[in-house]
Amino acid sequence: YLAPKQLGFRTSMNRTYNEYEVRNNFGGLTIPQYNKMFNWDRDYNLKYDITKSLKFDFTAKNRAFVNEPFGKVDEGAFGYDADSSKTQMVNSIKSFGETMNYGHTANVTFKWPFNKFPLTDWITLTTRYSGNYDWTRSPLALDNFEVIDENGVAQTRKVGNIIQNSRVVTW
């Protein structure tokens, strides 16, 4: 019981790139749209049996967004510079990206020792405490947006994050 029963870490990176352009049926100017997404998911878990009757487990999930330059990924097109793009992505990865979602759950389970006494060896009672925490970042598009107030003055606003937590005790 000196070492954890299980210690785990999993990571995955998912990078997608889409380029959309409307079919030019009318001879007008068509502007392509680019959709880039580079997510980095990390999962952690720990299970530790402190004693035969007392057990602890912890799991956490983190989703981060890796920053990269806007626009088309094409060497030499529209001022795209592969070296600066790589530098920006590597720096973002070194700082573990920008966390968008984080959540963890901790559980403590205790099995009461009624089986140690002859009169109560037929009773089984387990108590479990579970605590949960979730954090969601505001959308990147809403980091700094302007709102025109009743006087016609533009004011910069920032949307907040969402935090939720809960706890459950079961007998």
Task: Give a label for each model feature.
Residues 1-8, 47-58, 112-125:
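Short loop/turn motifs that connect adjacent beta-strands in outer-membrane beta-barrel proteins
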Residues 18-27, 67-77, 136-146:
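Outer-membrane beta-barrel translocator domains and adjoining extracellular loop/strand segments
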Residues 36-42, 100-106, 163-171:
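Residues that define the transmembrane beta-barrel architecture of outer-membrane proteins
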Residues 74-88, 141-159:
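Solvent-exposed loop segments that connect transmembrane elements
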